[in-house]
Amino acid sequence: MSDMLPLATYSLNVLPYIPTPAIDIEMPVTVRITMAALDPEALDDQKQPSTLRIVKRNPNFDDEEYDDLLNGDYDEDEMASDDEEEEEEEEEEEKPAKKSKKSKGKKKDESEDEEEEEESDSDLDEEDDDDEFEEYVLATLSPKTQYQQTLDLTIAPEEEIQFIVTGSYAISLVGNYIKHPFDTPMGDMDDSEDEDGSDYDDELSDSYYNDQYSDDDAEDSDEHDLTPDEDELAPAGSVEEIEASEEEESEEEEKKSKHKKHDHHHHHDHDHDHDHEHKSKNKKRKQEEEEPKKEHKDKKVKFKKDLEEGPTKKEKAESKKADKTPKRRTLEGGVVIEDRTVGDGPAAKKGDRVGMRYIGKLKNGKVFDKNTSGKPFVFKLGRGEVIKGWDVGVAGMSVGSERRIIIPAPYAYGKQALPGIPANSELTFDVKLVSIK
């Protein structure tokens, strides 16, 4: 998927002194504005140059009540007490006001105090409004000096942005509706999944999942591997094979001695006593030879049995497998990240232009969007060009890093439904950072 592809022509006519939303609620699609042009027909007799301003919500504005409701952190007792206070105030207002005898001077003082309180409250409200919204000048156009001005503004549907014109002339904005990185319909992606889904799928899955299977294989193979010392202590055969080989050797020696005895008796009958003495010597020598063998055999088996061994390779493989388990962290707004691979170089920070590969899935495992080949998806981190969960989850990654980002609905698209993404959807992204500028 290539990012920022134009879909259709965008146009907006901004009349003087009328705040105009940048994006229609009925068509929540990302827009890119490239030109502002002046309407040469004046709407009043003053014919003053028109100044185009953009008004947007302050990202640093701390609306605690809104954040608490968004994250589910609110005090039920406190809300109940607020409701009770409101009910009491309503009851007091419904009661008939009692007439009190007061001097005219006191009434005048009270009215002045009330006016001062109302003025201070209105001043505070105006300050809050000023803190909540920011206003910036984009261009000043006049039929005498300049009719138009090139722009390059990208506005996402979730941004609260309006345009205001001050002056005598209307200003028209033109550009394109563009393909948002998360706006790919399910049907389009299913068709292309077999064609271009091999590159990054292998990159992500092989680097993480194959490690788990390779660890299991390593355990099986390590169980049958012996060290050189173990090979020396326990050769190919078992204890029974050692005993069988020694018995065969003794039988061969007995056959040889019997054969010699038979020949000697057949040819030298007169040396019978000498032969008997020779036989007893052979028997004694045979016993002396067998005793060291048995001793050596017992030592072998005993030494093998009582051998103290260090940590086995299986235990080492299990410890390595535990070390490879991704570390899970919870960030702002409930965004969860799991680092699969740690890259090299500096970490991405707010304002950096980052290039990403990614695979986006719903909670049920269905893939709704991906960028695994071709041109990477590039955006400016922390500037609101993507959903808030990406600005939070991508921060801190370095080139080559792979990470899983689990984004709750308030930090994704919230109640807004997009093609392939139902409303209030939790989104999961497997991402890889490929460039930082």
Curated annotation (Swiss-Prot):
Residues 42-146, 179-328 are annotated as: Disordered. Its EC number is 5.2.1.8. It is an enzyme of class 5 (isomerase). GO terms for cellular component: chromatin; nucleolus. Inhibited by both FK506 and rapamycin. Residues 351-437 form the PPIase FKBP-type domain. SUPFAM superfamilies: FKBP-like (SSF54534). Residues 286-295, 304-328 have a biased composition (Basic and acidic residues). Pfam families: FKBP_C, NPL. Residues 61-94, 111-135, 188-205, 213-233, 240-252 have a biased composition (Acidic residues). Keywords: Isomerase, Nucleus, Rotamase. It comes from the Eukaryota. The keyword Isomerase applies. PROSITE patterns: FKBP_PPIASE. One of its GO terms (molecular function) is peptidyl-prolyl cis-trans isomerase activity. Residues 257-269 have a biased composition (Basic residues). It is found in: Nucleus, Nucleolus. Gene3D superfamilies: 3.10.50.40, Nucleoplasmin core domain. PPIases accelerate the folding of proteins. It catalyzes the cis-trans isomerization of proline imidic peptide bonds in oligopeptides. The gene is FPR3. The keyword Nucleus applies. This is FK506-binding protein 3. Belongs to the FKBP-type PPIase family. FKBP3/4 subfamily.
